[in-house]
């Protein structure tokens, strides 16, 4: 990925707003940024501390802990699709923060990669409605940018009560495997590490 230099454009703040107005806007923006950080923290918490503890008691790491160990020291992963399914409530008052999968641009061995990791703090890494779309979107970006794609697999398959919403349509789960094939056909490296459950759709990832 290329470095894009940022240069100022347009008038300076002093030319378009007085200090009082600028201060009011800064305060309003700070409130919105706090809300964004809180929402991001909620997604990153998955189903909560009890589920993080359950993962650790199995001797495993969470998806984001694995991601932190994978990336180059001193670098920061850039998550995409963080708020997919955020605020949605499924039958039984179930939630799927981030659609149960972490997708992120990350530096690995000095090279930008796309990382796709099942969030094992959300229904043991199950796929939910819009999980396939999120994975496919990450694969599409990897294909366009020719980024090696790394799958961190710890997946219990589809979340069965919602499976009818995950398979059908032009963006259904099967199209993930089409993207696997397209990435291979275009010479984009794909690697998979299996760290736990590898069931149903999730089981195809390291094979294809």
Q: Where in this protein do the model-derived segments appear?
A:
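Terminal-region recognition feature
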Residues: 1-192, 196-197, 201-202, 208
């Amino acid at each position: 990925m290329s470095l894009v230099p940022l240069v100022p454009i347009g008038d300076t703040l002093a030319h378009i707003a007085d200090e009082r107005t600028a201060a009011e806007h800064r305060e309003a923006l700070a409130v919105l940024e706090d809300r964004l950080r809180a929402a991001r923290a909620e997604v990153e918490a998955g189903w909560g501390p009890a589920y993080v503890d359950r993962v650790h008691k199995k001797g495993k790491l969470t998806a984001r802990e694995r991601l932190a160990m994978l990336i180059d020291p001193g670098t920061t992963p850039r998550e995409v699709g963080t708020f997919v399914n955020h605020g949605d409530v499924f039958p039984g008052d179930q939630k799927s923060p981030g659609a149960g999968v972490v997708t992120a641009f990350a530096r690995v061995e000095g090279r930008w990669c796309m990382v796709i990791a099942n969030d094992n703090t959300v229904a043991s890494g199950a796929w939910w409605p819009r999980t396939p779309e999120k994975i496919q979107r990450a694969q599409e970006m990897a294909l366009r940018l020719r980024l090696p794609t790394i799958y961190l697999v710890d997946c219990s398959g589809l979340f069965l009560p919602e499976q009818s919403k995950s398979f059908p349509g032009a963006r259904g789960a099967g199209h993930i495997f089409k993207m696997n094939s397209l990435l291979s056909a275009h010479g984009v490296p794909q690697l998979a590490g299996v760290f736990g459950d590898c069931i149903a759709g999730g089981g195809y990832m390291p094979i294809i």
